[in-house]
Amino acid sequence: TERSLKKMFKYLFINQKNYPAVLKANILKKKSKIKNLNVETIKVSHGTMQTIGFKINKFAYIPDFKKIEKTELKKLKNLDVLIIDCFRYRPHNTHVNFDECLEYIKLINPKRAYLTNMYHEMDYFKLKTKIKNKNILPCYDGLKIKI
């Protein structure tokens, strides 16, 4: 991810003649402690690119992904809250679709799950009626989640 970002957005990381660098890459360890938070990175596949999600205590945020390996899934047990990619209804090569998203939620089995990163065809109210579990909800702008 770092290599890809630096290649695509070189000007943000390296001083240019008329443009100073504005970002510095901070590489996270697999496990970190920030104050009273245990932060763990979760490796996921986003098409051919590897990206990461985050587990923070009993909360996880996994936005852009197509596949989570079994070893990484094990790290996501006993979650209170999961925010997970749910791009669209039809299959996509770099994101999980609705059915795949629900399968991952079933495997991870969090107390509550929120769907994010939704394509414009994912109407909030229609999506809510398609979800048969009251502990799974689509995200919306301005949503506040108590963790």
Task: Walk through the language-model features, giving the residues of each.
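Binuclear metal-dependent hydrolase catalytic cores
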Residues: 1-62, 66, 128-147
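Binuclear metal-ion centers of metallo-dependent hydrolases, dominated by the metallo-beta-lactamase
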Residues: 69-81, 86-147
